[in-house]
Amino acid sequence: MTAAKPKPTPTAAKSAASFLYHALHWTLRLSALAFIVREAYRIRLYAITDYGRVIHEFDPWFNFRATQYLAANGYEAFFKWFDYKSWYPLGRPVGTTIYPGMQITSVLIWKALNAIGAGKLPFALPYLTGAGAATTVAWVTEYDVAMSLNDVCVFVPAWFGALATIFLGLLTYECARGLKITSAAWAGVAAAGIMSIVPAHIMRSVGGGFDNESVAVTAMCATFYFWVRSLRADDPHAHRWGVVTGLAYINMVAAWGGYIFVLNMIGVHTACLVAMGRYSRKLCYSYCLFYFIGTAGAMQVPVVGWTPLKSLEQLGPCLCFLIMIALEVCESRRRAGGYKFLSVANVKVYLAVGIACAAALAAVVAALLPTGYFGPLSSRIRGLFVKHTRTGNPLVDSVAEHQPATQAAYYQYLHYSTYPAFAGGALCLLGFSDAKSFLVAYIAVAYYFSAKMMRLILLMGPITSALAGLALGFAADWCVDQALLPIGGVFKWAFPVMLGDAKAEEEVEKEEEGEKAAAADADADADAADKKKPAAAAAAAAAAAGPSLGARLTRWALLIYNSVPVCLLRMAAAAKLCQWAYPHGRTFYDYSHQLAVGMSHPSIMFKGKLQNGETIIVDDYREAYWWLRDNTPEDARVMAWWDYGYQLAGIANRTTIADGNTWNHEHIATLGRALTSPEKEAHRMVRHLADYVLLWTGGGGDDLAKSPHMARIGNSVYEDICPGDPTCQRFGFMQGGVPTKMMSDSLLYRLHSGGQQKGVFVDPNRFKNVYNSKYNKVRIWKVLAVSEKSKAWAADPANRKCDAPGSWYCVGRYPPALRKLFKKKGIKKKSFAQLEDFNKKKSKKDEAYQKAYMDKMAGKGGAGGAGGAKQAQAAIREAQEKAKAAAAKLPKEQQAHRRRRRDAALAAAKAMKWADSEASSQMHKLVAAGDTTSLEAWITAQPDVVHLRSADGRGPLWWANELGQAKVAKLLKSYGCQKTLKDKGGKKPSALLKKNKKAKKAAAKKANKEEAKEVL
């Protein structure tokens, strides 16, 4: 009989199994993570690949300009920067109104890269020759990491998008620890994979989109990770991570105003844990360290200052901080006295401390409340709690991102990731812990607020990825284990657990029990210490009695689960699961890339095709700004709607009237008054404020589309613009696209369409057309008869109002001539801020205005009387007659402008490929549902979607006509959807409208016949 080969000892077998098993798993995990991080970076580079290293949109141009100023002038000058090239003539104290985190980070990266610069890196690789002699191969690699500041700012969103992916993976890993049914590491990898490409994150982190959120999401994920790390159950010193949490939170505060969400999220989580009876010294120390360090650091950011201790939306976490201290005082007394929790002595301690704290808090509030110390909820924050879709502030309501989110929006930005997220949420309820409860609280709060404001869908990206990662991590862990079974069959000694080795199972069980006991001991308090001896005695008695019935059943179940037939079934099931999951994962991957391409189209330039098929880049906006930079004096003042202020200052380097900071509602209202007033009256104002007027005139989201907001914002301060009508319904267009009298007389309409539309002319003594862009997207007019006296007065530093002698904080003032003009005309201005501040008493007139505005925006109230329809029809006829009379007066060169404008619109329409896609399917659903709110929000975010075409060549306008959605069709046309294009069969959208009308007539005729038969 052949002697049996010596088998490895159980200890050696276990060591080998553990090493090989974990080595294979970690090799797969690290390989997957490397691919994920690379993908997170690559998917954000479409804009850079297609359009070059260009800063996008509006806000990023201010951020870049501020970064340039910081790099050139240093920190001290930056925080004392009063910018007189914006918000003319008032100026803006940039140093105290900016979140500087992104600028500081970008400058540090830029300096570091340029400090490293270019160089050579030597490498040497020793090896043995065939003769056994040692030799070395050496080579030199050249590198150059130096970059311009522009390039650093362009790449920052992509870099931090990849970094946010890593932190989200760590957060998920930490929350998944202790969940026996899945591997925490695989859960982290799966969550990172989703986070890397989920559109909800990409929409704020594409290359060139140098906006605060691109850095802030990384800071938010880091803060949340360090917070849950500070609550780790099996680490007695985990609370020290509260210090790191506070430091990460300071970075978050410096980066974005959304830090309020992070602060309240951690506060809510802490309060929930206390309410569930999970208070512990670790929780108290972690939260207090975070709040104290984080708040102290946040108050050093000038734009924040004392608001954490004054603003209502931040006082909740402050109250939680005080309660945690009071609870710890009570618990310390209880531990010192050895009281039981429900004992009379302990109740007395809690009552005494509670009453003392409540009395002290009430005294402080009573003393500060009459002084106006506590600030009100801002209009944006209030909009998250009101029941309607309006905040009462027409400036806030004018921004599409501030409107409520729809289910279509969730699907658009989260797609398939929502389905495994539901399963992940259920997994959080298994093995409930402090860390996993954070995910439950996060999803509840984030969903509520994102439903109120579409912009906050950004917050859903990380939590959806984390929850989906829990579910997919479980599936990935199980599938990898099944894939390793054949290897375990070859090296049976290496995988004893997987193949049912009883001794190895016992060792594993003992280890798990030991880890569980260690974790329980680490978190035990005084009560547990009292029960330690009886528990140990009970455990010894149970061990002497032998394994329980449950333990025996578990062992038999493991033996069956690890039997060869079941192992084969498990392998087959894993293969089938992968086969089923791959197409869905691929669809999500392709959809995310498709949407990333759409999100990477900068609004400042776009691709298109002319009628002859030539592909072009429409760069009208930058060319207009360059024209201003190269052809106007350096001190030229340019009036434009506030949307374009950042780009004007950043690219043209010219003085602007207002920009996206929107810090002064009354000043924007003055700008709105100037643009919506009749030409003659407007010129009397404009000549004191500007040398040039710039308008976007390219259809879709141009200035005419924004005109209702201009009038409403202006009317909120100057009630004589639209007396008795807070929504300014008289300033707009009637049936057939005919402007109302107020619109046709306005400076905005005259400068927008003057000389290009029939019957629209501009007074040559007041304004001169000096520039029209190639595709008529931008028009620039020079203001004639400018008041040089007012310009000189505003430029004189002596006329600025400083907060102290010699201070840098000196606010400009309106020229006396403009103030006299307002006084002479009897123009009265009110402070809109009082309508938002509940600390100030509102007059009955203010309350009536607010109520009327809300009612009008909600669709309540009439259009202005019974004769409104007749007056509108009369106005239409009058306008049509005027247009016919003036048709012959249109010069030939102006006809050329109209042709170029039409070509630009057609170019945009033909830029989209004909293909059946997720986007076209989603568009068809919205059109079919008549969901104009979601459509307008989508179009505002991505203007080119109006030109989507399916494989048959049809787009949203065809579908709207076919389905009888007249309101949708009107909306699409207002955003530049072309009605002259043809589908694959050569049909125009109007053909389907006629067909739909015929079908309705036929159906009505048939119904009448059937009704007549029934009567007979």
Regions found by a protein language model. Name each.
Residues K5-K7, K14, I116, K120, ...:
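Extracytoplasmic
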Residues M1-A47, F58, R333, L342-A358, ...:
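Start-transfer (signal-anchor) and selected internal transmembrane alpha helices
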Residues S18-P60, R65, A72-Y75, F82, ...:
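Transmembrane signal-anchor helices characteristic of membrane glycosylation enzymes that use polyprenol
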Residues A34-L163, V198, D211-S214:
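Membrane-interface coil-to-helix junctions
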Residues K925-G930, W959-Q965, L992-N996:
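Ankyrin repeat A-helix N-terminal signature
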Residues L312-R334, K348-F438, A524:
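Alpha-helical transmembrane segments at the extracellular/periplasmic loop-to-helix junctions
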Residues L33-Y41, Y84-K85, A138-N150, V154-R278, ...:
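Membrane-embedded helix bundles of polyisoprenyl
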